[in-house]
Amino acid sequence: MFQRLILILFFSVYGLMAKGQQNINSIDSFRLYGDVKITIDKPVNFSPNKKTIISFFALPNGNSTEQTMGKKMQTGDDWHFDIQHIRAQTKFIRQQLPKKNFVVIYLENNYKSWPAWKQKHPDFKNEIPHLVDSLAGLLEAKQKVIYLNGHSGGGSFIFGYLAGVEQIPSSVKRISFLDSDYGYDSSYYPKFKNWLQQVKGAALNVFAYNDSVALYNGKPVVSARGGTWYRSHLLLQHLQKDFSFSKTNTDSLIIYKSGNSQIQFYFKLNLNQGIYHTQQVELNGFIHSVLCGTKKDSKKYSYYSTRAYADLIK
């Protein structure tokens, strides 16, 4: 029933496609479950003959899809429009991957919080995987892979997906936590381990800053064990029992990579007790979450550096 409904919605959105791609906006939205907004950013030159990457991006708490996409700022604009720029970063990624279709599916809900949405949906363990599978099924391509990505509370969507599958399917090739793995605990580790060891091309990357010392108005932002710094290190500790890692340091980052770069962790130092939550996305974070460990890793951009996509912001 759900798949039938989603197909009806899809064809109502893309029903004009047969009349010519030149007349089709590459971004379209529709709603599911009554409280979920789906926005598909599909390249205008989409070809079913190209390998297709479908990147699900679960929105951070408190942000709309439009704010997450970003825009060129004008006087009076809300500051949220200038902190992620996923749309411009998507354009950059497409320039680096011209032989592939790179599709982004933004996932927003009425509560602007995936943890809150899951509380309202006790059957989320079934609903989230079904949502992902059904949306991926809408895109016709000879070869499709799924990336799961999210910032802040968006990580809760990813964990909801993981909780709902017995094992991570081989169609999922990349999981990225952009300062968003607050919900990690040891119960998820066996699924990560089996997926990384058994699925060819599986890649995991995690971004976090030392939020355990961050202050806002003189008060801690998170508890000592409640933030991504602690949760990311916990995941790393579990992985180190089964995978070997190298460690490197820069002026502001501690980086761990597995031997084949299949797994990567980026830890942002915090020497002034500041808040560096959104900067990890803004400073080429989405780009790096997609390209790190590939042949395009750090080509024409650097993570946590000047916006490589600045001229693509509209």
Show the residue positions of the predicted features.
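The feature captures the conserved acid-bearing segment of alpha/beta-hydrolase catalytic domains
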Residues: 166-256
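C-terminal accessory extensions appended to soluble enzyme cores
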Residues: 215-314
